[in-house]
């Protein structure tokens, strides 16, 4: 199935049902009190993470989604039925962003996690709510409020521990094939990898991590050169980045210039991403003699003024790949657990305060001394007014 990692959709929550104006009409009760019921709340729209999905392609073709409207209230104090919520299934790792405000509504990182993206309208109040000692036959009601309407940008961001960076044909796909069972396409031309690939690495029994391979970057990617930088977002959740560098480029280019170009594109896209731990990995070391290899590595490290970790591997021959995988496993295990976002932090929705405000208005007209039990005894006494 085609890999689609971004889609724009429009979600509309259901409107709230309106309240009802109605009065009791029963035999021997000529002056029945109000019995109009409230409307039902409108259905809300939720996103739910599903581990069985791995693309947003369905939302490229189906862009408009509506939740049910709440039913209107009816007589005899019958409350309208609430609208059914709409649940949209998305892949794990999806982020929802409001297109108008650019506000991030939340991330779905675990299977079954739900996120409210459009809140249903609040129900209208029936005339029973407005009865008082001075207004025994109220004809007031309130209408249900409209449901929330949002334009959402869904962004699928892969969940991986290790991310691979590098120029096209640096050997990233070959490396992921050598350390995992993933089988991305490998060929001798640039941009063989067109979509991100994931692989599970198990360096020791009972220990594993996920590695992500994205299409190669070239200089000017931030301006749209090559495949651009749209796939860099898949590395934002990685805990460490491997900068794969071709020690002997077939085009004769200088690896130093290639490394600087990659770092420059990384900083243009996201300073936060550029600040993540990054290891320098020299690939295709089997193409050079041992003495020549060491001289070239020392020169590149010196010119880059590199202070971090440096590793030499041959992904094709699987030389040094297992040792690198073990180092990565130890590094990931030593990292502190990621700080989760505050689960109590909620997005403000349009009608969050409507219920409270409406109830305050009703309470202003309500008389505590009034008996709100409208039974037959209330009408057995004839009131006579004398001048």
From Swiss-Prot:
It comes from the Bacteria. GO terms for molecular function: GTP binding; GTPase activity; magnesium ion binding. This is GTPase Obg. Mg(2+) binds at residues 173, 193. Belongs to the TRAFAC class OBG-HflX-like GTPase superfamily. OBG GTPase family. GO terms for cellular component: cytoplasm. It is an enzyme of class 3 (hydrolase). Residues 1-159 form the Obg domain. GO terms for biological process: ribosome biogenesis. It holds the Pfam family GTP1_OBG. It comes from Shewanella loihica (strain ATCC BAA-1088 / PV-4). Its cofactor is Mg(2+). Residues 160-333 form the OBG-type G domain. Monomer. Its EC number is 3.6.5.-. GTP binds at residues 166-173, 191-195, 213-216, 283-286, 314-316.
